[in-house]
Amino acid sequence: MKLAIIGIATLAGLFSIDQVAAADGKAVYDKSCGGCHNAMDPKLGDKAKWGPIAKRGTDALVATVIKGKGAMPPKGGTTLSNEDIKAAVEYMISKAK
């Protein structure tokens, strides 16, 4: 019984960590996107490059990231969830405003 309670508590803790990660676009960007987007176009915060991209809308950009485009492989070459991708896209767009 003690092991079952410990197991449930551990799983609950992991679940809450995943929820925080999904909601934190900056953390997702820093871990999974910045390696390329800090060095290559469109760079984070480049308003001239991101302006036209952002006009397509979040849903369209998330779909592009999931599918991949140009030099960017599907999901940026990561195993991110769609929710994490959306959070990162929203963060990147917010830095271009």
Model-derived segments and their meaning:
Residues 1-23, 91-97:
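Post-cleavage N-terminal segment of exported redox proteins
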Residues 43-53, 63-97:
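Axial heme c-ligation environment in periplasmic c-type cytochrome domains
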Residues 30-39, 88:
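The canonical Cys-X-X-Cys-His
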Residues 5, 20-21, 33, 73, ...:
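Secondary-structure boundary/capping signal
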Residues 11-28, 40-51, 58:
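Electrostatic cytochrome c docking/interface patches
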